Protein backbone atom coordinates (compact mmCIF):
# COMPACT_ATOMS: atom_id res chain seq x y z
CA UNK A 1 0.00 0.00 0.00
CA UNK A 2 2.83 2.37 0.95
CA UNK A 3 4.57 1.60 -2.33
CA UNK A 4 1.36 2.29 -4.27
CA UNK A 5 0.92 5.63 -2.56
CA UNK A 6 4.55 6.61 -2.98
CA UNK A 7 4.62 5.70 -6.64
CA UNK A 8 1.15 7.02 -7.17
CA UNK A 9 0.06 7.95 -10.59
CA UNK A 10 1.92 10.69 -12.06
CA UNK A 11 -0.54 12.31 -14.24
CA UNK A 12 0.92 15.10 -12.23
CA UNK A 13 -0.61 17.29 -14.87
CA UNK A 14 2.46 16.10 -15.91
CA UNK A 15 4.18 16.93 -12.85
CA UNK A 16 4.38 20.69 -13.06
CA UNK A 17 5.82 20.30 -16.48
CA UNK A 18 2.95 22.31 -17.82
CA UNK A 19 5.50 25.01 -18.46
CA UNK A 20 2.88 27.72 -18.67
CA UNK A 21 2.66 27.52 -22.43
CA UNK A 22 1.10 30.52 -24.12
CA UNK A 23 -2.21 29.98 -25.81
CA UNK A 24 -1.94 29.33 -29.52
CA UNK A 25 -4.32 29.49 -32.41
CA UNK A 26 -6.22 26.21 -32.16
CA UNK A 27 -7.28 23.95 -34.99
CA UNK A 28 -10.39 21.87 -34.48
CA UNK A 29 -10.05 20.49 -30.98
CA UNK A 30 -9.12 16.80 -30.97
CA UNK A 31 -11.72 14.50 -29.45
CA UNK A 32 -12.28 10.88 -28.63
CA UNK A 33 -10.15 8.49 -26.64
CA UNK A 34 -6.70 9.96 -25.90
CA UNK A 35 -3.57 8.27 -27.20
CA UNK A 36 -1.42 7.90 -24.09
CA UNK A 37 2.33 8.46 -24.17
CA UNK A 38 4.17 7.64 -20.95
CA UNK A 39 7.67 8.37 -19.71
CA UNK A 40 9.43 6.39 -16.97
CA UNK A 41 12.30 8.34 -15.48
CA UNK A 42 13.78 10.25 -12.59
CA UNK A 43 11.96 13.55 -12.34
CA UNK A 44 14.76 15.29 -10.43
CA UNK A 45 17.52 14.20 -12.81
CA UNK A 46 19.06 17.13 -14.72
CA UNK A 47 19.42 14.74 -17.64
CA UNK A 48 15.92 13.26 -17.68
CA UNK A 49 13.67 16.12 -16.61
CA UNK A 50 14.37 18.22 -19.75
CA UNK A 51 13.34 15.23 -21.89
CA UNK A 52 10.02 15.07 -20.10
CA UNK A 53 9.54 18.83 -20.36
CA UNK A 54 10.27 18.97 -24.09
CA UNK A 55 7.98 16.02 -24.82
CA UNK A 56 5.17 17.77 -22.97
CA UNK A 57 5.74 20.80 -25.20
CA UNK A 58 5.53 18.58 -28.30
CA UNK A 59 2.31 16.96 -27.07
CA UNK A 60 0.74 20.37 -26.41
CA UNK A 61 1.79 21.59 -29.86
CA UNK A 62 0.27 18.57 -31.58
CA UNK A 63 -2.96 18.83 -29.61
CA UNK A 64 -3.20 22.55 -30.42
CA UNK A 65 -2.90 21.64 -34.10
CA UNK A 66 -5.72 19.09 -33.96
CA UNK A 67 -4.11 16.01 -32.42
CA UNK A 68 -3.31 12.81 -34.29
CA UNK A 69 -6.02 11.54 -36.64
CA UNK A 70 -8.37 13.80 -34.70
CA UNK A 71 -7.52 12.22 -31.33
CA UNK A 72 -5.73 14.02 -28.49
CA UNK A 73 -2.43 12.92 -27.04
CA UNK A 74 -2.12 12.50 -23.28
CA UNK A 75 1.28 12.61 -21.60
CA UNK A 76 1.86 10.83 -18.29
CA UNK A 77 5.03 10.54 -16.21
CA UNK A 78 6.06 7.78 -13.82
CA UNK A 79 8.77 9.01 -11.47
CA UNK A 80 11.19 6.14 -10.87
CA UNK A 81 13.27 8.16 -8.38
CA UNK A 82 16.33 6.61 -10.03
CA UNK A 83 15.42 3.08 -8.91
CA UNK A 84 15.13 0.03 -11.14
CA UNK A 85 12.28 -1.50 -9.14
CA UNK A 86 10.21 1.69 -9.40
CA UNK A 87 10.91 1.81 -13.14
CA UNK A 88 9.35 -1.62 -13.58
CA UNK A 89 6.42 -0.67 -11.38
CA UNK A 90 5.98 2.63 -13.21
CA UNK A 91 5.86 1.03 -16.64
CA UNK A 92 3.39 -1.56 -15.34
CA UNK A 93 1.07 1.14 -14.03
CA UNK A 94 1.29 3.12 -17.26
CA UNK A 95 0.15 0.03 -19.15
CA UNK A 96 -2.51 -1.24 -16.77
CA UNK A 97 -4.01 1.98 -15.42
CA UNK A 98 -3.29 4.54 -18.14
CA UNK A 99 -3.51 2.16 -21.14
CA UNK A 100 -0.35 3.72 -22.59
CA UNK A 101 0.40 2.83 -26.22
CA UNK A 102 3.89 4.31 -26.21
CA UNK A 103 6.27 4.21 -23.26
CA UNK A 104 9.64 5.93 -23.04
CA UNK A 105 12.26 4.81 -20.54
CA UNK A 106 15.10 7.07 -19.41
CA UNK A 107 18.51 6.38 -20.88
CA UNK A 108 20.21 4.15 -18.36
CA UNK A 109 20.86 0.70 -19.75
CA UNK A 110 20.32 -1.09 -16.43
CA UNK A 111 16.89 0.49 -15.98
CA UNK A 112 15.90 -0.05 -19.61
CA UNK A 113 16.77 -3.76 -19.44
CA UNK A 114 14.54 -4.30 -16.41
CA UNK A 115 11.65 -2.33 -17.91
CA UNK A 116 12.07 -4.18 -21.20
CA UNK A 117 11.82 -7.62 -19.60
CA UNK A 118 8.69 -6.69 -17.67
CA UNK A 119 7.11 -5.10 -20.73
CA UNK A 120 7.76 -8.25 -22.77
CA UNK A 121 5.89 -10.29 -20.17
CA UNK A 122 2.92 -7.90 -20.40
CA UNK A 123 2.95 -7.33 -24.16
CA UNK A 124 0.34 -9.94 -25.08
CA UNK A 125 -2.26 -8.39 -22.77
CA UNK A 126 -1.10 -4.79 -23.18
CA UNK A 127 0.33 -4.33 -26.70
CA UNK A 128 2.45 -1.20 -26.92
CA UNK A 129 5.67 0.34 -28.23
CA UNK A 130 8.61 0.87 -25.85
CA UNK A 131 11.30 3.42 -26.75
CA UNK A 132 14.57 3.72 -24.84
CA UNK A 133 15.52 7.41 -24.67
CA UNK A 134 19.28 7.62 -25.05
CA UNK A 135 20.91 4.44 -23.66
CA UNK A 136 23.74 2.70 -25.49
CA UNK A 137 23.79 -0.80 -23.99
CA UNK A 138 23.95 -3.20 -26.91
CA UNK A 139 22.00 -5.85 -25.00
CA UNK A 140 18.81 -3.85 -25.48
CA UNK A 141 18.73 -4.44 -29.22
CA UNK A 142 20.82 -7.63 -29.39
CA UNK A 143 17.84 -9.41 -27.89
CA UNK A 144 15.42 -7.92 -30.43
CA UNK A 145 17.10 -10.02 -33.11
CA UNK A 146 17.70 -12.99 -30.83
CA UNK A 147 14.00 -13.18 -29.88
CA UNK A 148 12.14 -10.94 -32.31
CA UNK A 149 8.63 -12.05 -31.41
CA UNK A 150 9.29 -11.39 -27.74
CA UNK A 151 10.98 -7.99 -28.09
CA UNK A 152 9.79 -6.69 -31.48
CA UNK A 153 8.02 -3.73 -29.83
CA UNK A 154 11.30 -2.29 -28.44
CA UNK A 155 13.26 0.53 -30.09
CA UNK A 156 16.23 2.66 -29.06
CA UNK A 157 16.25 6.33 -30.16
CA UNK A 158 20.04 6.45 -29.85
CA UNK A 159 22.77 4.29 -31.32
CA UNK A 160 24.58 1.39 -29.59
CA UNK A 161 28.23 1.40 -28.51
CA UNK A 162 29.66 -0.03 -31.78
CA UNK A 163 28.28 2.99 -33.66
CA UNK A 164 30.80 5.28 -31.98
CA UNK A 165 33.98 3.77 -33.38
CA UNK A 166 33.81 5.75 -36.64
CA UNK A 167 33.49 8.98 -34.66
CA UNK A 168 36.53 8.24 -32.50
CA UNK A 169 38.62 7.21 -35.48
CA UNK A 170 37.73 10.49 -37.14
CA UNK A 171 38.69 12.49 -34.04
CA UNK A 172 41.94 10.67 -33.33
CA UNK A 173 43.01 10.20 -36.93
CA UNK A 174 41.89 13.51 -38.43
CA UNK A 175 40.65 16.39 -36.30
CA UNK A 176 43.19 16.05 -33.49
CA UNK A 177 46.00 16.45 -36.03
CA UNK A 178 44.68 19.94 -36.75
CA UNK A 179 44.12 20.74 -33.10
CA UNK A 180 47.61 19.62 -32.10
CA UNK A 181 49.89 20.54 -35.03
CA UNK A 182 53.01 19.83 -32.95
CA UNK A 183 51.79 16.28 -32.43
CA UNK A 184 49.99 14.37 -29.69
CA UNK A 185 51.72 11.34 -28.22
CA UNK A 186 50.28 10.92 -24.70
CA UNK A 187 46.75 11.04 -23.36
CA UNK A 188 44.75 10.22 -20.24
CA UNK A 189 41.30 8.63 -20.31
CA UNK A 190 38.68 8.77 -17.56
CA UNK A 191 35.72 6.44 -17.93
CA UNK A 192 32.32 6.81 -16.31
CA UNK A 193 32.20 3.59 -14.30
CA UNK A 194 28.91 2.23 -15.63
CA UNK A 195 28.01 -0.65 -17.93
CA UNK A 196 27.73 1.43 -21.09
CA UNK A 197 31.48 2.23 -21.18
CA UNK A 198 32.66 -1.37 -20.72
CA UNK A 199 32.42 -2.37 -24.40
CA UNK A 200 34.80 0.48 -25.23
CA UNK A 201 37.10 -0.38 -22.35
CA UNK A 202 37.15 -4.11 -23.12
CA UNK A 203 36.41 -4.14 -26.84
CA UNK A 204 33.79 -6.28 -28.56
CA UNK A 205 35.57 -9.35 -29.96
CA UNK A 206 32.37 -10.80 -31.42
CA UNK A 207 32.11 -7.71 -33.62
CA UNK A 208 35.86 -7.51 -34.25
CA UNK A 209 36.03 -4.17 -32.43
CA UNK A 210 39.11 -3.44 -30.28
CA UNK A 211 39.28 -1.62 -26.93
CA UNK A 212 39.59 2.12 -27.51
CA UNK A 213 42.91 2.32 -25.69
CA UNK A 214 44.36 -0.34 -27.95
CA UNK A 215 42.92 1.39 -31.01
CA UNK A 216 44.33 4.84 -30.24
CA UNK A 217 47.77 3.42 -29.41
CA UNK A 218 48.07 0.92 -32.25
CA UNK A 219 46.44 2.89 -35.06
CA UNK A 220 47.24 6.50 -34.13
CA UNK A 221 50.43 6.30 -32.09
CA UNK A 222 49.00 7.94 -28.98
CA UNK A 223 50.03 6.24 -25.74
CA UNK A 224 47.43 6.09 -22.97
CA UNK A 225 49.54 7.02 -19.95
CA UNK A 226 46.64 7.09 -17.47
CA UNK A 227 43.29 5.28 -17.47
CA UNK A 228 40.76 5.13 -14.65
CA UNK A 229 37.07 4.30 -14.21
CA UNK A 230 35.41 6.84 -11.90
CA UNK A 231 32.03 7.10 -10.21
CA UNK A 232 29.55 9.19 -12.21
CA UNK A 233 28.86 11.42 -9.22
CA UNK A 234 30.70 12.35 -6.05
CA UNK A 235 34.23 11.69 -7.27
CA UNK A 236 37.04 13.73 -5.75
CA UNK A 237 38.89 14.64 -8.92
CA UNK A 238 41.80 16.69 -7.57
CA UNK A 239 43.99 13.68 -6.61
CA UNK A 240 43.25 12.08 -9.99
CA UNK A 241 44.14 15.26 -11.86
CA UNK A 242 47.33 15.56 -9.83
CA UNK A 243 48.30 12.05 -10.94
CA UNK A 244 47.45 12.85 -14.56
CA UNK A 245 49.61 15.98 -14.44
CA UNK A 246 52.56 13.82 -13.42
CA UNK A 247 52.22 11.48 -16.42
CA UNK A 248 53.03 14.01 -19.11
CA UNK A 249 49.60 13.57 -20.71
CA UNK A 250 48.87 16.14 -23.41
CA UNK A 251 45.13 15.50 -23.51
CA UNK A 252 42.40 14.31 -21.12
CA UNK A 253 39.47 12.44 -22.63
CA UNK A 254 36.58 11.99 -20.20
CA UNK A 255 34.03 9.41 -21.39
CA UNK A 256 31.16 11.08 -19.54
CA UNK A 257 27.37 11.06 -19.85
CA UNK A 258 24.40 13.16 -18.77
CA UNK A 259 24.66 11.51 -15.32
CA UNK A 260 28.31 12.49 -14.79
CA UNK A 261 29.07 15.46 -12.54
CA UNK A 262 31.14 17.12 -15.25
CA UNK A 263 30.46 20.51 -13.69
CA UNK A 264 32.30 19.39 -10.55
CA UNK A 265 35.09 17.95 -12.69
CA UNK A 266 35.45 21.24 -14.58
CA UNK A 267 35.73 23.28 -11.39
CA UNK A 268 38.39 20.98 -9.94
CA UNK A 269 40.29 20.77 -13.24
CA UNK A 270 40.55 24.56 -13.48
CA UNK A 271 42.18 24.70 -10.03
CA UNK A 272 44.41 21.65 -10.47
CA UNK A 273 47.93 20.95 -11.63
CA UNK A 274 46.36 19.59 -14.83
CA UNK A 275 44.58 22.83 -15.76
CA UNK A 276 46.77 23.38 -18.83
CA UNK A 277 45.97 19.91 -20.22
CA UNK A 278 43.09 20.17 -22.73
CA UNK A 279 39.91 18.25 -21.90
CA UNK A 280 37.40 16.60 -24.22
CA UNK A 281 34.08 15.62 -22.61
CA UNK A 282 32.21 12.81 -24.29
CA UNK A 283 28.74 13.78 -23.12
CA UNK A 284 26.69 15.50 -20.44
CA UNK A 285 25.48 18.92 -19.40
CA UNK A 286 28.41 20.54 -21.21
CA UNK A 287 26.32 20.45 -24.39
CA UNK A 288 24.64 23.79 -23.64
CA UNK A 289 25.58 27.26 -22.42
CA UNK A 290 24.23 26.32 -18.98
CA UNK A 291 27.56 24.58 -18.41
CA UNK A 292 29.38 27.92 -18.42
CA UNK A 293 27.04 29.17 -15.70
CA UNK A 294 27.15 25.92 -13.71
CA UNK A 295 30.95 26.04 -13.58
CA UNK A 296 31.30 29.77 -13.08
CA UNK A 297 33.30 29.89 -16.31
CA UNK A 298 35.82 27.30 -15.14
CA UNK A 299 35.06 25.16 -18.19
CA UNK A 300 37.06 27.69 -20.25
CA UNK A 301 38.90 25.71 -22.93
CA UNK A 302 36.91 22.47 -22.60
CA UNK A 303 35.69 20.72 -25.75
CA UNK A 304 32.64 18.57 -26.42
CA UNK A 305 29.40 18.28 -28.34
CA UNK A 306 27.48 21.57 -28.30
CA UNK A 307 23.86 21.25 -29.31
CA UNK A 308 22.41 24.59 -28.21
CA UNK A 309 23.38 25.62 -31.71
CA UNK A 310 21.81 28.29 -33.87
CA UNK A 311 23.22 26.74 -37.01
CA UNK A 312 20.84 25.48 -39.73
CA UNK A 313 21.91 21.84 -39.48
CA UNK A 314 18.41 21.12 -40.79
CA UNK A 315 15.45 23.43 -41.31
CA UNK A 316 14.25 22.47 -37.83
CA UNK A 317 17.40 23.22 -35.81
CA UNK A 318 17.10 26.96 -35.14
CA UNK A 319 13.32 26.93 -34.48
CA UNK A 320 13.78 24.04 -32.04
CA UNK A 321 16.62 25.69 -30.11
CA UNK A 322 14.74 29.01 -29.92
CA UNK A 323 11.57 27.26 -28.73
CA UNK A 324 13.44 25.27 -26.07
CA UNK A 325 15.31 28.39 -24.92
CA UNK A 326 12.00 30.23 -24.58
CA UNK A 327 10.79 27.46 -22.25
CA UNK A 328 14.15 27.35 -20.43
CA UNK A 329 14.75 23.73 -21.42
CA UNK A 330 18.42 22.82 -22.04
CA UNK A 331 19.01 21.33 -25.47
CA UNK A 332 21.30 18.38 -24.79
CA UNK A 333 21.41 15.70 -27.50
CA UNK A 334 18.86 13.45 -25.82
CA UNK A 335 16.47 16.41 -25.47
CA UNK A 336 16.60 16.96 -29.24
CA UNK A 337 15.83 13.25 -29.61
CA UNK A 338 12.99 13.27 -27.07
CA UNK A 339 11.18 16.07 -28.88
CA UNK A 340 11.75 14.44 -32.27
CA UNK A 341 10.39 11.16 -30.89
CA UNK A 342 6.93 12.61 -30.29
CA UNK A 343 6.60 13.90 -33.84
CA UNK A 344 7.98 10.61 -35.11
CA UNK A 345 5.26 8.80 -33.13
CA UNK A 346 2.67 11.10 -34.70
CA UNK A 347 3.78 10.03 -38.17
CA UNK A 348 3.92 6.38 -37.08
CA UNK A 349 0.30 6.49 -35.89
CA UNK A 350 -0.82 8.22 -39.08
CA UNK A 351 1.05 5.67 -41.20
CA UNK A 352 -0.48 2.77 -39.25
CA UNK A 353 -3.96 4.29 -39.52
CA UNK A 354 -4.41 4.42 -35.74
CA UNK A 355 -3.25 2.54 -32.66
CA UNK A 356 -5.46 -0.56 -32.72
CA UNK A 357 -3.04 -2.81 -34.59
CA UNK A 358 0.33 -3.00 -32.82
CA UNK A 359 1.92 -4.94 -35.68
CA UNK A 360 1.13 -2.04 -38.00
CA UNK A 361 2.65 0.34 -35.45
CA UNK A 362 5.81 -1.78 -35.28
CA UNK A 363 6.04 -1.87 -39.07
CA UNK A 364 5.65 1.90 -39.20
CA UNK A 365 8.31 2.34 -36.52
CA UNK A 366 10.64 0.30 -38.72
CA UNK A 367 9.94 2.22 -41.93
CA UNK A 368 8.98 5.83 -41.15
CA UNK A 369 11.55 8.62 -41.46
CA UNK A 370 11.31 12.22 -40.26
CA UNK A 371 13.62 15.22 -40.23
CA UNK A 372 14.52 16.66 -36.84
CA UNK A 373 16.87 19.28 -35.43
CA UNK A 374 20.02 17.13 -35.60
CA UNK A 375 19.33 15.17 -38.77
CA UNK A 376 17.05 12.25 -39.63
CA UNK A 377 14.97 10.18 -37.24
CA UNK A 378 14.78 6.61 -38.52
CA UNK A 379 15.50 3.12 -37.24
CA UNK A 380 18.00 0.65 -38.67
CA UNK A 381 16.29 -2.14 -40.59
CA UNK A 382 19.37 -4.18 -41.48
CA UNK A 383 19.15 -7.28 -39.34
CA UNK A 384 22.58 -6.97 -37.77
CA UNK A 385 23.13 -6.88 -34.01
CA UNK A 386 23.03 -4.51 -32.17
CA UNK A 387 22.00 -1.95 -34.81
CA UNK A 388 18.57 -3.37 -35.68
CA UNK A 389 15.82 -1.25 -34.03
CA UNK A 390 18.41 1.38 -32.99
CA UNK A 391 18.50 4.87 -34.48
CA UNK A 392 20.49 4.91 -37.70
CA UNK A 393 24.00 6.35 -37.62
CA UNK A 394 26.74 4.16 -39.12
CA UNK A 395 26.72 1.48 -41.78
CA UNK A 396 26.46 -1.81 -39.83
CA UNK A 397 28.65 -3.43 -42.49
CA UNK A 398 31.50 -0.95 -41.79
CA UNK A 399 30.87 0.65 -38.39
CA UNK A 400 34.47 1.74 -37.86
CA UNK A 401 34.74 3.89 -40.95
CA UNK A 402 31.40 4.72 -42.60
CA UNK A 403 28.79 7.10 -41.18
CA UNK A 404 25.48 7.76 -42.94
CA UNK A 405 25.61 11.44 -43.99
CA UNK A 406 23.03 13.78 -42.52
CA UNK A 407 21.37 11.37 -40.10
CA UNK A 408 23.16 12.62 -36.96
CA UNK A 409 24.81 16.02 -37.25
CA UNK A 410 26.92 16.62 -34.16
CA UNK A 411 28.51 20.05 -33.66
CA UNK A 412 31.77 20.02 -31.68
CA UNK A 413 32.57 23.20 -29.79
CA UNK A 414 35.06 24.73 -27.36
CA UNK A 415 34.22 27.15 -24.56
CA UNK A 416 36.07 30.41 -25.21
CA UNK A 417 36.27 33.62 -23.22
CA UNK A 418 33.01 34.94 -21.86
CA UNK A 419 31.27 31.64 -22.58
CA UNK A 420 31.44 32.11 -26.34
CA UNK A 421 31.38 28.85 -28.29
CA UNK A 422 33.96 28.28 -30.99
CA UNK A 423 32.78 25.50 -33.27
CA UNK A 424 35.45 23.00 -34.32
CA UNK A 425 33.47 21.16 -37.00
CA UNK A 426 31.50 17.94 -36.70
CA UNK A 427 32.04 14.33 -35.68
CA UNK A 428 32.45 12.65 -39.06
CA UNK A 429 33.91 13.45 -42.46
CA UNK A 430 30.54 12.85 -44.13
CA UNK A 431 29.01 15.90 -42.39
CA UNK A 432 31.91 18.36 -42.60
CA UNK A 433 30.44 20.30 -45.57
CA UNK A 434 27.67 21.43 -43.20
CA UNK A 435 30.23 23.20 -41.01
CA UNK A 436 32.07 25.02 -43.78
CA UNK A 437 32.45 28.62 -42.66
CA UNK A 438 31.19 27.80 -39.15
CA UNK A 439 34.32 26.38 -37.55
CA UNK A 440 37.16 23.92 -38.04
CA UNK A 441 39.45 21.86 -35.77
CA UNK A 442 42.35 24.29 -36.18
CA UNK A 443 40.24 26.99 -34.45
CA UNK A 444 40.99 25.17 -31.18
CA UNK A 445 42.89 27.26 -28.60
CA UNK A 446 44.87 25.82 -25.69
CA UNK A 447 43.29 26.49 -22.25
CA UNK A 448 46.38 28.34 -20.99
CA UNK A 449 46.16 30.78 -23.90
CA UNK A 450 42.46 31.40 -23.25
CA UNK A 451 43.21 32.20 -19.60
CA UNK A 452 45.87 34.68 -20.70
CA UNK A 453 43.30 36.41 -22.87
CA UNK A 454 41.02 36.71 -19.86
CA UNK A 455 43.68 38.71 -18.03
CA UNK A 456 44.20 41.25 -20.81
Label the predicted regions.
Residues 326-335, 346-430, 453-456:
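Segments of small-molecule ligand-sensing domains
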Residues 100-227, 277-303:
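Extracytoplasmic ligand/sensor domains, especially the bilobed periplasmic-binding protein
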Residues 1-36, 64, 445-456:
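Short, low-complexity disordered leader/linker segments with a strong preference
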Residues 137, 141, 151-162, 268-341, ...:
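Extracellular/periplasmic periplasmic-binding protein-like sensory domains
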Residues 48-56, 84, 197-213, 314, ...:
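Short, surface-exposed alpha-helical segments at coil->helix boundaries
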Residues 25-39, 67-72, 176-186:
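Immediate post-signal peptide segment of exported/extracytoplasmic ligand-binding proteins
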Residues 29-34, 46-56, 65-147, 157, ...:
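Beta-alpha junction/loop-to-helix N-cap segments that form part of ligand/metal-binding clefts
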Residues 56-67, 92-100, 116-124, 173-177, ...:
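Sec-exported extracytoplasmic/periplasmic mature domains
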